[in-house]
Regions:
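Bacterial N-terminal signal peptides that target proteins for export
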Residues: 1-11
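Conserved functional loop/turn residues at catalytic and ligand-binding sites
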Residues: 5, 14, 84, 145
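C-terminal segment of classical bacterial N-terminal signal peptides
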Residues: 15-25
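Bilobed "Venus flytrap"/periplasmic-binding protein-like clamshell domains
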Residues: 31-56, 123-177
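Pocket-flanking alpha-helical
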Residues: 51-53, 66-108, 135
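Surface-exposed patches in mature extracellular/periplasmic domains of secreted proteins
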Residues: 61-68, 175
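A structural signal for short loop-to-beta-strand junctions that line the ligand-binding cleft
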Residues: 107-120
């Protein structure tokens, strides 16, 4: 099976599974927007590649795909729920929390209409530091400059869960960006 056909099947499955808002427009008038992440990350080019493949054969299926740079996983899920995005790339842990109404999604409740269409890649949580930083464990991050991720991103959400578990907040670090 060609890659294009594979992604067409994925997009069709998403459209048929209720991920998009229902409309009464004709096939020639269907538009799909994929929420991704920052333009320098992995999610944005992934969404762009999917849209290029979908748009390549747009004349036969009548769907036009566009990609939107966003804040990332948590933002994408919230925006899909609000009906402002059709599809979005999200870390699986944040999809799990949204579906079950836990963590950052507790106030909004379970989002049981949310569906996974495909997986891009595994996303382990990794902390790295320069060899000369003196950092050998998580406790050593206190008082250091730490990238905690962009607001709305899965990285930021995961870091906030970790900070809460450790009893930390942004003031724990010399600089939290």
């Amino acid at each position: 099976m060609k890659k294009f056909n594979f992604f067409s099947v994925l997009l069709s499955a998403a459209l048929l599974s209720g991920v998009t808002a229902s409309t009464t427009v004709t096939a020639a008038d269907q538009f799909v927007t994929i929420g991704t992440g920052g333009v320098t990350g992995v999610y944005y080019p992934t969404g762009g590649s999917i849209c290029r493949l979908v748009n390549k054969d747009r004349a036969s299926h009548g769907v036009r795909c566009t990609v939107e740079s966003t804040g990332g996983s948590v933002y994408n899920i919230n925006t899909i729920r609000a009906g402002e995005l059709d599809l979005g790339v999200a870390q699986s842990d944040w999809q799990y929390h949204a579906y079950n109404g836990t963590s950052k999604f507790a106030d909004a409740g379970a989002f049981t209409d949310l569906r996974a269409v495909f997986s891009v890649h595994p996303e382990p949580f990794t902390v790295v530091a320069r060899a000369d930083s003196g950092i050998t464990n998580l406790e050593d991050l206190q008082g250091k400059r730490v990238n905690i991720g962009n607001p709305g991103s899965g990285q930021r959400g995961t870091m906030e869960v970790l900070m809460e578990a450790l009893g930390w907040d942004k003031s724990t670090f010399a600089l939290a960006s």
